[in-house]
A protein has these predicted regions:
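Helix C-cap/helix->beta junction micro-motif
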Residues: 31, 86-87, 207, 241, ...
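Conserved core segment of the aminotransferase class I/II
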Residues: 113-194, 198-202, 281
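Phosphate-binding glycine-rich loop
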Residues: 1-13, 228
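Conserved glycine-rich beta-strand-loop-beta hairpin in the small C-terminal domain of fold type I
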Residues: 175, 190-201, 211-224, 255
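PLP-dependent enzyme catalytic core of the Aspartate aminotransferase-like
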Residues: 227, 236-246, 251-284
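A short helix->loop->beta-strand "cap" motif at the edges of active sites that frequently abuts
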Residues: 12, 33, 86-90, 117-118
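Active-site phosphate-binding strand-loop segment of PLP-dependent enzymes
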Residues: 38-111
Length: 284
């Protein structure tokens, strides 16, 4: 994702949702770009829409979202594509978690929207769909229709100059993902993580804790109980349940008072963690 910024001017204005995957912000801070924040809140379902957005040259959209688990519908993304066209902006669409989408009407790709090829770049990774974390293998779609094909040519030149591809053995592993056997195993893994998410969600439901995500995403985004702050809840959960999660505040100011749990884990450990969380919450 960070390599794409080589295609853009340093004086471009960047729009990111808040809370946000920190890399989007850090990449642009290091480049000296101006960053604008678009609040993603419980009131807008953690899916901010362009009618709330200021002008910007580049907007980041991650759907299903990290950290909130919220997922845009195709209809909602149509509005973002229209906004990008009206503002002569580029959408950088992070589809790393698209494999978790299961509900009809929710988007797995920005290119499900007509006209998106004129305004959007999509990035996806094998790290989530196939457990390829650390191998740095993924793919980027830079359409010919975007900026008259200029960005496509620039991206090809950039990649052949600065990056000659991941190791061959990794590429062959990625190729295996798309075989019948590979897709079957991946579906089994996805079902495994979905089951973990359901276990966590059930524990939170029984404890009366508000949350979103977990259905089309591996992440569950919960509101900290008793108006605790994110870090306060982190300390409390560690002390009383011996469970670790991620404080929402680490993803931006709008993450204050929220907390992220993940379904990426062993099933038995997830059940144990969920039981501990439920028991600890019962003492409040």
């Amino acid at each position: 994702m960070g390599n794409l910024l080589d295609l853009f001017s340093q004086d471009n204005t960047i729009l990111v949702p808040d809370p946000v995957y920190p890399v989007y912000v850090d990449d642009n801070v290091m480049a000296g770009r101006k960053i604008l924040y678009l609040p993603a809140t419980a009131e807008n379902g953690f899916l901010p829409m362009p009618d709330e957005a200021p002008h910007a040259d580049i907007v980041y959209i991650c759907s299903p979202n990290n950290p909130t688990g919220a997922t845009y519908s195709v209809e909602q993304l149509k509005a973002w594509v229209a906004w990008a066209k009206a503002n002569d902006a580029v959408i950088l669409f992070d589809a790393a978690y698209e494999c978790f989408v299961s509900e009809p009407g929710l988007a797995r790709s920005i290119f499900e929207v007509e006209g998106a090829k004129e305004v959007a770049i999509e990035v996806c990774s094998f790290s989530k769909i196939a457990g390829f974390t650390g191998t740095r293998c993924g793919y980027t779609v830079v359409p010919q229709a975007l900026a008259g094909g200029k960005l496509n040519k620039m991206w090809l030149r950039r990649q052949t100059t600065k990056f000659n591809g991941v190791a061959y053995v990794v590429q062959r592993g990625a190729e295996a993902v798309f075989t019948d056997e590979g897709m079957k195993e991946i579906q089994q893994n996805l079902d495994y993580y979905r089951a973990n998410a359901a276990v966590i969600a059930a524990a939170l439901d029984e404890a009366g804790v508000w949350y979103c995500g977990g259905k089309n995403s591996p992440y569950i985004w919960l509101r900290c109980p008793n108006e605790m702050g994110s870090w306060e809840f982190f300390d409390w959960l560690l002390e009383h349940a011996h469970v670790v999660g991620t404080p929402g505040e680490g993803f931006g100011p709008c993450g204050k008072g929220y907390f992220r749990l993940t379904a990426f884990g062993d099933a038995e450990r997830t059940k144990e963690a969920a039981a501990r969380i439920k028991a600890a919450l019962a003492t409040l």
